[in-house]
Design a protein with these regions (language model features):
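Conserved, mostly hydrophobic/aromatic
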Residues: 71
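Active-site loops and adjacent core secondary-structure elements that bind or stabilize anionic groups
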Residues: 5-18, 50-51, 55-59, 94, ...
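Short, acidic/polar
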Residues: 92-99, 145-155
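Active-site mouth loops of central-metabolism enzymes
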Residues: 75-92, 132-147
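Conserved, well-structured core domains of diverse proteins
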Residues: 1-40
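Single conserved hydrophobic/aromatic residue that forms the stacking wall/gate
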Residues: 156-167
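Alpha-helix-loop-beta-strand connector modules within alpha/beta enzyme cores
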Residues: 120-137
Length: 167
């Protein structure tokens, strides 16, 4: 903590002992081990979604605190792999991305369907996966910022466990 105080300098007291007086504490959902029961259970989310959320909140170094740390890696698709991974070429390999998330104690790893699909058999039971479906198509000129869905997966909507959308 002393390093933090040193970094904050003269403003350490202000930042570390700040009490908000503009928003009533009762209006805030404070993270905690019961976040699924307090926030999500009464929502319209289906049972599988609630189960997946509990797996996510219950995994990694922040397990059951109500906080999450997710390693998001989709740079190789959206922003070219050369620009993103050239300094660390081992991350061209999807397995190393997942290993990094596990070693870092992340609650989950988020990436594209292809990246996660390539390593799912080996790692899906070791860390929750979050599939990112929102990708811009930046391969053409001029750039198109339309969201392009690609890959093949099955999504369950929050309306009912039986509703399925094939992407």
């Amino acid at each position: 903590m002393s390093k933090t105080v040193d970094l904050l300098g003269q403003q350490a007291e202000y930042y570390l002992n700040h009490t908000c007086k503009t928003i009533d504490k009762k209006l805030i959902h404070v993270p905690g081990p019961d976040v699924i029961d307090k926030i999500w259970v009464d929502s319209d989310r289906n049972v599988r979604t609630l189960n997946s959320l509990q797996a996510l909140y219950g995994h990694g170094r922040l397990a059951n605190t109500g906080y999450v740390s997710i390693l998001p890696v989709d740079q190789d698709i959206e922003h070219t792999a050369g620009a993103s991974f050239a300094p660390n070429p081992i991350y061209f390999d999807p397995e190393n991305i997942v290993k990094l998330a596990i070693e870092g104690g992340c609650n989950a790893v988020a990436s594209t369907f292809g990246i996660l699909g390539a390593v799912a058999r080996k790692y899906a039971h070791k860390i929750p996966f979050v599939v990112k479906l929102n990708h811009n198509e930046l391969l053409t000129y001029p750039n198109s910022y339309d969201q392009v869905m690609f890959g093949t997966c099955l999504l369950y909507t929050s309306d009912a466990a039986d509703d399925r959308i094939s992407v």
